[in-house]
């Protein structure tokens, strides 16, 4: 399956493949990052992309799943965070020029979970 095809699968299909160890969370994340890199210059949908940390999280998920510690259907799935939620150490502008340099020192509760 091509990288583009992986990103076009439903989240439930991606989750099933990850759970069944037929798809690596790292492979899926790399596919998503490649798609962002290819299309975001045109779409401008992302303010900040944290590719390195996303890959780190995917590697951890892959190790956990390989060790039989699958935590549920969202485990190992890539996700984006709207720029209106505080993310510790990551530029969070709230879509405003006034907040153009805002880098929170804490995560929003929904991010912590």
Question: At which residue positions do the language-model features occur?
Answer:
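Hydrophobic alpha-helical segments, principally membrane-spanning helices and signal/leader peptides
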Residues: 5-6, 61, 67, 92
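Conserved SET/PR domain catalytic loop and adjacent active-site segment
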Residues: 22, 69-70, 90
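Enzymes and membrane/adaptor proteins characterized by extended Gly/Ser/Thr/Asp/Glu-rich
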Residues: 11, 73-110
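N-terminal Rossmann-like NAD(P)+-binding subdomain of aldehyde/semialdehyde dehydrogenases
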Residues: 41, 62, 85
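An N-terminal boundary/leader segment
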Residues: 1-56
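Flexible, acidic active-site loops/lids enriched in D/E/S/T/G that coordinate Mg2+ and/or position polar
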Residues: 51-75, 81, 100, 104
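Generic hydrophobic, aliphatic-rich segments that mediate packing or membrane embedding
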Residues: 42, 50, 57, 90, ...
